[in-house]
């Protein structure tokens, strides 16, 4: 797993942002904010992961000018649409369905619930100079 003090890898990946299909480019978030919180989850609609993302939503993390938030799941863009809409998520939901982003952060699960090459549950916080300031798997 990527650790505190490491340099975070950049990525561009398909995402749902404000109800629209988009590409999330990490470098844009890093340039525009003091910190970026990446919330990795193996799949959408997993009760534990949904509770975590709902807590972030309810805490208003996305309302801070100095912090960007993005969720990353191992599901398709279509699942990300349904998930973001169902739970009214105000931050981007990235579809890391091939596990490339998770792999670059050394967060790829060998297997989970019969699936492979999907993200493990984790939170990674990156500052504006690309340094990982917090990293934890759950």
Where are these regions (language model features)?
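Chalcogenol-based redox active-site neighborhoods
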Residues: 1-138
């Amino acid at each position: 797993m990527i650790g505190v003090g490491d340099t975070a890898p950049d990525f561009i990946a398909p995402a749902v942002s404000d109800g629209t299909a988009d590409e999330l480019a990490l470098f844009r978030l890093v340039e525009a904010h003091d910190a970026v919180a990446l919330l990795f989850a193996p799949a959408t609609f997993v009760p534990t992961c949904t509770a975590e993302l709902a807590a972030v939503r309810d805490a208003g993390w996305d309302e801070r000018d100095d912090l960007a938030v993005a969720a990353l799941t191992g599901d398709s863009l279509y699942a990300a649409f349904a998930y973001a809409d169902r739970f009214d998520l105000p931050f981007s939901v990235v579809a890391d369905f091939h596990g490339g982003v998770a792999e670059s952060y050394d967060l790829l699960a060998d297997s989970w619930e019969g699936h492979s090459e999907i993200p493990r549950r984790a939170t990674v916080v990156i500052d504006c100079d690309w340094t990982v300031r917090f990293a934890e798997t759950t």
